[in-house]
């Protein structure tokens, strides 16, 4: 989301907060002749043409797809050809059509990762939950919590 928001900032001279607000409501399925995209932020209204907005979002997704495609060409073997690519939901949760666009561009299935936890099974939470899980795993492996649990045989 951040890289695409920066593209929007540069192209349309928007503050970062406005660019992320526009991305949160992005829909790649909109007809190109749809009315302009509008966001009100800080008492000011920002309006950009839908066609250019969609083109810029797709261009940002294409840049990401190029990086992933290059990685797959250089680093993957045959075992990865039939497996899906999992995308964390934080940046893509609000962009309708992003996964489909990436799937077409990469010629493979792209799926959104969502943790299997009650109330946290939203794709938008997957990046945060993954970081929390990683941090708590490190803490359990080497921190004072491990020493404390070892006292009780845990």
Residues covered by each model-derived region:
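Helical "lid/coupling" subdomains associated with nucleotide-phosphate turnover
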Residues: 1-21, 28-154
């Amino acid at each position: 989301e951040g890289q695409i928001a920066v593209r929007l900032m540069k192209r349309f001279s928007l503050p970062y907060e406005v660019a992320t607000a526009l991305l949160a409501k992005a829909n790649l399925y909109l007809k190109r002749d749809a009315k302009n995209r509008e966001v009100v932020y800080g008492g000011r209204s920002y309006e950009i043409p839908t066609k250019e907005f969609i083109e810029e979002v797709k261009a940002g997704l294409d840049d990401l797809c190029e990086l992933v495609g290059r990685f797959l060409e250089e680093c993957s073997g045959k075992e990865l050809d039939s497996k899906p690519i999992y995308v964390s939901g934080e940046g893509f949760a609000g962009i309708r059509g992003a996964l489909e666009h990436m799937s077409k561009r990469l010629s493979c299935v792209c799926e959104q990762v969502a943790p299997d936890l009650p109330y946290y099974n939203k794709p938008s939470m997957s990046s945060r939950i993954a970081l929390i899980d990683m941090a708590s795993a490190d803490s359990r492996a080497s921190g004072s919590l491990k020493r404390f649990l070892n006292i009780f045989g845990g």
